[in-house]
């Protein structure tokens, strides 16, 4: 009886150790959780700029633009400054409708379908004032 109990205890400990190792491996190997990055349209200081102007994301991350100061604002992607210089991609990402109310927002989730690279965007009414931003998608 003692022998059976000892074998049973040893097997239980071995099984527990195996489950713990596999669980730890899966936790380490699981992809990072997607993040949401908020970009203010119009800086808190009152300047006509995106804040922050440069954002780096990974596939699955979301960029959310929030109307903050000095509206109206919109988000247009420059078709000559997106990966592949694709007008179709730039149009797909752009939000040409003007946002007038504080707190209005627009967001894009950069899925794995989007090519890695730098995406340049601007606010059409304030581009001449330097309201330009960049998103870098890392693969």
Swiss-Prot record:
One of its GO terms (molecular function) is copper ion binding. Keywords: Copper, Electron transport, Membrane, Metal-binding, Signal, Thylakoid, Transport. InterPro entries: BlueCu_1, BlueCu_1_BS, Copper_blue_Plastocyanin, Cupredoxin, Plastocyanin, Plastocyanin_cyanobac. It is a peripheral membrane protein. One of its GO terms (cellular component) is plasma membrane-derived thylakoid membrane. Residues 1-34 form the signal peptide. Residues 35-139 form the Plastocyanin-like domain. Its cofactor is Cu(2+). Cu cation binds at residues 73, 123, 126, 131. Participates in electron transfer between P700 and the cytochrome b6-f complex in photosystem I. PANTHER family: PLASTOCYANIN MAJOR ISOFORM, CHLOROPLASTIC-RELATED. Belongs to the plastocyanin family. This is Plastocyanin.
């Amino acid at each position: 009886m003692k022998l059976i109990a000892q074998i049973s205890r040893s097997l239980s400990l071995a099984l527990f150790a195996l489950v713990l190792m596999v669980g730890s491996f899966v936790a380490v190997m699981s992809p990072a959780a997607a993040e949401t990055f908020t970009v203010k349209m119009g800086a808190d200081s009152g300047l006509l700029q995106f804040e922050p102007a440069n954002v780096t994301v990974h596939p699955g991350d979301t960029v959310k633009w929030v109307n903050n100061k000095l509206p109206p604002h919109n988000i247009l992607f420059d078709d000559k400054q997106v990966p592949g210089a694709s007008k179709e991609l730039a149009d797909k990402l752009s939000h040409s409708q003007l946002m007038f109310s504080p707190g209005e927002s627009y967001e894009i989730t950069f899925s794995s379908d989007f090519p890695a690279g730098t995406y340049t965007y601007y606010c059409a009414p304030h581009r001449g004032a330097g309201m330009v931003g960049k998103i870098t998608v890392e693969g």
